[in-house]
Amino acid sequence: MSIVKKLIKDHKMIPHPEGGHYVEIFRNDDVTHIYFLLEAHENSHWHRITKTETLHFYSGSPLNVYTSKDGVEFQIDEIGSNNNFMYTVEKGTWFALKSTGAYSLIGCTVAPAFEFEDLELAPKAVSYTHLRAHETLG
């Protein structure tokens, strides 16, 4: 069994609406935390939430974090390399994620606690186009 299939099975991960797989591992009124897994052929579609989210790198290949506050100017950062193992996305910021290798396993902490009504997905055509167009900026 591949490491990706093992992670999904062992942690009982399910498909996430933005792409990849996840499992919620902690929740209270103040904060939520999930494990989030992206394989090489997946990306997290452009989305934004109404709360601040911190990404924590756990294993696999480094992860590109694409962000845009206004949908016009874009930034690419990487977590999981060069001693950079976390990244915070401010509330309302558009962002997308892409593994640089076979897979990336991260944690996502949202405060106050995440609810799915906090999530806004960009149209998939827009998501795909912008991610591919800006992939080489890093």
Language-model-detected regions and their locations in the chain:
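A short glycine-rich, His/Asp/Glu-containing loop-to-beta-strand
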Residues: 20-40
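Glycine- and acidic-residue-biased ligand/ion/polar-headgroup-sensing regions
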Residues: 40-41, 50-69
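Portal/gating segments that form or line small-molecule/metal binding sites
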Residues: 65, 73-83
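Conserved small/polar residues in nucleotide/adenosyl-binding loops
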Residues: 129-136
